[in-house]
């Protein structure tokens, strides 16, 4: 799922094709074989008082009408990709979109997933409460028709009651534990959330580190640190590693509106295998394989990856890695040369 902020040219002027950068993301998805769920981000204001965007934000900015046009054009772009591609929508946050537009998001975009930042930082909670007389989760629950289409990103500043009520809507909590730790945003209440049948997904919001195993490890360790417990997310029949991996797979499938997460007829063949010949996994079986990968290994143990049956990683190396890395280095050199 690509939470896509950047839409316009420097200075905030739209490209001739308003969905030009969505087109670039589609091209990248095609080259890498990723099963793309594109989430164009609607970002209009710099705060709840509807102040203007800063110079660093104007390439994100769209009125609601222009955003609808962008979304429509981006949808056309995706028709050229494989059929496991889909599109949703992402009103950035309660601070960045007009209050009347927020209330209508579910009806204005009647299909596809909806992702939005919610209750990420203390400052956000206080700003929303000052302007709208309610905490972010309180306001969203009362005004936005939360249901299983929604994925709320971070959710690190929720009260116990908010955690329970939001979990019971069927919405997914989209967690980015490395970023939330790096920025000091707070700790998601994963124990209370899962006790109330809440679904969660894992994302890599970080520009510091991108690693699935490390995101899962950080999620679990954060629960232990907050509550002073061990194996806080394990269940009697599933180890910690299996519990959080399967939870992330199930919630991620829901958040991306993708028929995946099971090796069954009718589901996309999204699969990965781990290198069990590695010393990190040697001799491990069953749940111990996942536990060792998440808590003692890293993503170098990922050996093979299939996306909707497309075999994109073989023996730990992406099939197009050579040309992608070479192009990336050339682009970095060009950018540095232009500074």
Question: What positions do the PLM features span?
Answer:
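Active-site microenvironment of metallo-dependent hydrolases
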Residues: 221, 243-339
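Short low-complexity, flexible loop/linker segments enriched in glycine and/or proline
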Residues: 15-18, 51-55, 129-131, 188-192, ...
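Histidine/acidic-residue-rich catalytic or RNA/ligand-binding cores of hydrolases
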Residues: 102, 122-136, 162-167, 184-193, ...
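Divalent metal-coordination and catalytic microenvironments
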Residues: 29, 89, 117, 152, ...
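His/Asp/Glu-enriched, well-ordered alpha-helical/loop segment
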Residues: 142-149, 191-280
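Anion (oxyanion) recognition and catalysis
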Residues: 30, 110, 167, 194-195
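Metal-coordinating catalytic core of metallo-dependent amide/deamination hydrolases
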Residues: 11-156
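Catalytic beta/alpha-barrel core
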Residues: 149-159, 175-181, 203
